[in-house]
C-alpha cells in the first residue's frame, strides 16, 4: 500500500486511514479511499487474486512513472502481450475507478459549498447570490432592467455524442452510489430504510462491476433519444422549475415595477433526433419518435405528480374553506367518493382531463391515467390555469406552505415544459438544401437549373416563391430519395407542432451557411410543410431560421449575410412575425478545426461584435446560439467564465448553448450539481446583460487590434502543421484512435460528413476526441505559443513592453483571461510522454519524427508563453480544484492509455477478436469519464 500524501492517491483495495495534506481535501480523499477499497475488494472477489494483483501492480507502477522513478517504457512493457482476458478486467477496474472518483469529486464540491454558506462567507462567484449582490450595487432602474430582460431565455440544448454510451442501468447505479455517498458525507451510517450505507455501497459497486458498461451493438438514434430524456427524471423536472421560480421572484422583488420574466428564463432544448447534418439515420419517423417521446415524458411526469398531489392534499371541507373557483373545479368530478375532500376531487378532474389530453396527442399510454370522460386540455396554459386555481385556494385559506411544495414545482414545470417537454431543433447542411430546392423548383417548372444561377438571381427567385401560398410539389410528386426524405422531416416537424404546440420544434439551423440564398432555401422547405406563409399581411412563421456560421471565413462574413437577410422585405416580415427576434448560431468546433484554438476564439468574438452592430442598426433583437462542445478545442470550458467573456451586447438577456456527451452527465446527472450549473448559466447571463463586464472601456479598440494580429499568427502556425505539413493526415490517422471511433460501435452518426480522410470533411467531435484519447489535446492549444512568441518579438516596442501589454490584457479583459485559462486546462490535461507512445503507432519513422517533433516543440513553447503572460509558474494556479483533480486522477489514466495503445496495435495488425475491439471501446469510455470533457 502506498502511503497517501498530497502527491499520491489511495490504492484501489485499501481504505486510507491517515489523512494528510490540505485539510479541505481530506473528506474527498477519504471518499475516494472508501470507494477505491470497495472496488478493489469487488475485483478480488469477482475476478480473483491474480487480476487484483495485476491491477494493483499497474497502479503502483503508474505512480512510479509519475514520480519519475521508472521509465514509461517499463509500464508499456508490462502490458505488451497481455492476455486479452486479463486486459479487459484491468481496463474495467480503472474505468470504474474514474467513474467513482467523479462521484467523490461532485460530493466534495457540494460539501465545500455547504461549508462556505454555513460559515457566513460572501457568496461565491457564479452563484445567483453573488450575482444579485452585484446587481444591487449597480442600482439599475426598472425600465433598463425590463428592456434588457424582455424575452430573456437561457437554453441548454442537449445534443447526442459518440462517447456518452453508458447504458441506463449504469446511469441509475451511479446515481444510487451518489445518493449513498451523499448520506455518508452527512455522517449517516444507515439509509432512511435502515440499510447499512457501506454494505449498500458494496452492493451497488458489485452491480456496477457485473453490468456491461457499453452496448455491444452500435448506438441507435432511439438510444440517444432515451439517453437525453433520462436527465429530466434525474434532475431537470425538479431543478429547472425551482431555478425559474427563484430567479423570477428575486428579480421581481428588486424591480417590482418591471414585470419581469413572464416566461421561464431556463428552457431546455434538444438536437437529438432533429440534427440530420451528415446523419442519414435522422428521418421523419425519428423526428416523430423524438418529439413523441419528449411529450410522453412530460405528460407522464405531470400525471405522476398529480397523483402524488392527490395523496398529499387530503384537506376536508369540514375543516378548511376553499375558493368558489376551486369548488367549481371540484364539482366536475362525478365520482361519489371523497365528497368532503375538494382538493382531491379538483386534482382528479385535472388528472382526468390530462389523461384525455394524453389519449389525444400521445401514441402510447402513460401510467397514473384516470379516465373520467372529461374533455382534454387544448393548451398547456389551460392546464396551468386549473393548477393555479388549486394554488390560489390554498393560499387564500392558510395553506401557502402546502402550495409552495410539490404543487409549486408542478405549476412551474407546466410553464416551462408544456406538452412538448423541450424544443427539438432541426439542422441540416446548406448543400443538402440547395440540392433539394433545385429539384423542387425543376419539378414545379419554376427553373430547370437553379444551381447554375448567381446569388442575386437565386435570392430573387426564392423570395418570389416565398411570397406565394402555393407549394412547389404535392404529396404525390415523384422525387428523389433525398428530396422525399427532407420533405418528410419538415412535415414531421409540422405534425409535432400541431400536436404538441409551436414550442415543440422552435428552430431550424442551417449548417455551413454562407449566403442569403442558403437561408431562403431552408425557408422554402419550411413553406412546403406549411411552416411558413408569407403571402399575406400577417406572415405565419412558428419556426425560426438560424444561420450557423462555422468556419473562420464564414464567421468573418456572418454580419454581412445577416444584414443582407434583413434587407429583404419578405424575410424582414418573417422576423417581425417572430417579435423582431433573430437567432444566429456560432460554430466553435469547425472554426477550431479550420483555424486552431486562438484564431477560432477570436473569430467568434469578432463575429459577435459585428452581429451585435447589425442588430443595433436594424432594430432587431439578436439571440446568439453557441455551438460549444465539451472540450476547449470545441468551444468548451467553464460556462460562467465563457459567458462573461462575451463582447458587449452579445448576450442581451438571452443565450442558447449546446451541451454534449459526458459533459451533460457531469453537469446534469445529479439534482444538486444540475442546479448549480443552471444557476451559473443564469447568473452569467444576468451579469453579462445588465453589467459592464468587458472591462476595457476606451482601450477596447487597441486590445482588439492586438488580438487581430495574434490570431493571424496563430492561424498561420496551425495551418502550417495541420493543412500544409506533408503526411499530416497519415500521422493523425495512425497516431490516434480516430479510425476506430468510426469502425467501432460508437454513436449513430458517421465520423465524417463525406467518405474521405480529409480533415475538412472529418467531424469536429472525432477530431477532438481522437487527440484527447492520445493525450495531445492538440485542438485546444496548437499555434498559440508560436503566435504569442512571434507577436512579442515583432512589434516596435521592446520585448518587455509587449509582454506587459499582454499581461495587462490578461488582468483586465475577461475574454483574454478566459482564453488563457482554458488553454491552461488543456495543457494540464495533455501528456506528451503518453502521446509519444501513440506516435509509435506511426510506421513511417521520418514522418513520426517530423510531426511529433513539431507538436512537442509547440507544446513547450505554449507552456512557456502562458507562464510569461500570466506570471504563473503553475498552469492551474488559478484553479486549485482542477489542479487537485488532475493531480489525483491522472496516475489512474496511465494504464488505460497504455492498454489502448497495445490493443490498437493488435487490432491494426489484424487481430479482430471481439474482445480486442471491446477493450479499445472500454479504454475510450474510461478515458472519457476520467477527463470529463474529452470529445
From Swiss-Prot:
| KW Magnesium (keyword) present | yes
Keyword annotations: Carbon dioxide fixation, Lyase, Magnesium
* Keyword DNA damage attributed: no
- Single GO BP term: tricarboxylic acid cycle
The source's superkingdom equals Bacteria
Q: Which reaction does it catalyse?
A: oxaloacetate + phosphate = phosphoenolpyruvate + hydrogencarbonate
Return the InterPro entries for the record.
PEP_COase, PEP_COase_bac/pln-type, PEP_COase_Lys_AS, PEPCASE_His_AS, Pyrv/PenolPyrv_kinase-like_dom
EC number(s): the record gives 4.1.1.31
Can you name a GO cellular component term?
A: cytosol
Q: Name one GO molecular function term.
A: magnesium ion binding
Active site per the UniProt annotation: 161, 593
Cofactor list? Mg(2+)
The entry's function note states: Forms oxaloacetate, a four-carbon dicarboxylic acid source for the tricarboxylic acid cycle.
Q: Which family does it belong to?
A: Belongs to the PEPCase type 1 family.
Protein's recorded name: Phosphoenolpyruvate carboxylase
Which organism is the protein's source?
Mycobacterium avium (strain 104)
State the encoding gene.
ppc
